Amino acid sequence: MSTLSVIIPTLNEERHVGALLSDVASQSRRPDEVLVVDAGSTDGTIEVVRRFPFARLLEGRPPVACGRNLGGRSATGDVLVFLDADVRLPERFFEDFFAEFERRRLDVACPLYATLDSTPVIEGFHALFNLLFKTVQRTLPSGAGHCLAVRRKVFRVSSGFDPKLKFDDIELIRRLAKGRRFGIVEQRVFVSDRRYREQGTPRMMLRYALMALVFALGKFAWANRIDYEFGKHEH
């Protein structure tokens, strides 16, 4: 059985990272290693992480790609799982996700996603994206970067996440999938709807639709022009 390393980059995530680490601790299949890479939080993120003795804290720096790369280089598991700090996991997520991951002999994979306590409009929008990801998984590999699993040997021979790009996760999926097995796995993670709440549902839906078009064209540098703020997650 493959060993699992979970990598969680953080920057001012005291309101969210504790819930994720609690979910990790409650998994029916516990990961073999949990790395939290903090990029200089000024809130209580560090104190929250230290309440979980199984989590190894690393000192990183912005942007998030640098934290992901540091975690990926430091991890020892056969499979690396990159998680955003505001993700929530069902109790059997790792067990069920990796049963399918191994059965399909995947090298790179993303789950489906949904939001907790969200509106029907947002849920319908996410369902549409899930369907899109599943439909194009062999021809145009894409996925929600909230959760990304990749075999360590595949990650190590790549240049990792590109810190020059805002959407480094999607670009890495596309790059790693070339000549390898990529798949969308039927298990779900739950993501925060905070961007919709803070910036408005119509505005965020328009941004995500624009991103989808840019990613379909493979113009990841163009996506840097999209107004999409990172690294200020105090809310």
Predicted regions and their residues:
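Acidic helix N-cap motif at the loop->helix transition within catalytic regions
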Residues: 15-19, 43-51
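Acidic donor-binding/catalytic loop of UDP-sugar-dependent glycosyltransferases
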Residues: 44, 85-99, 174
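Short, acidic, metal-binding catalytic loop of nucleotide-sugar glycosyltransferases
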Residues: 22-31
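Glycine-rich, basic loop-to-helix element that forms the pyrophosphate-binding segment
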Residues: 59-75
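Short aromatic/hydrophobic "clamp" motif used to bind/position activated sugar donors
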Residues: 80
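A conserved acidic beta->alpha catalytic loop
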Residues: 30, 38-46, 87
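Conserved donor NDP-sugar-binding/catalytic core segment of glycosyltransferases
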Residues: 92-121
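Acidic donor-binding loop at a coil-to-helix junction in glycosyltransferase catalytic cores
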Residues: 166-172
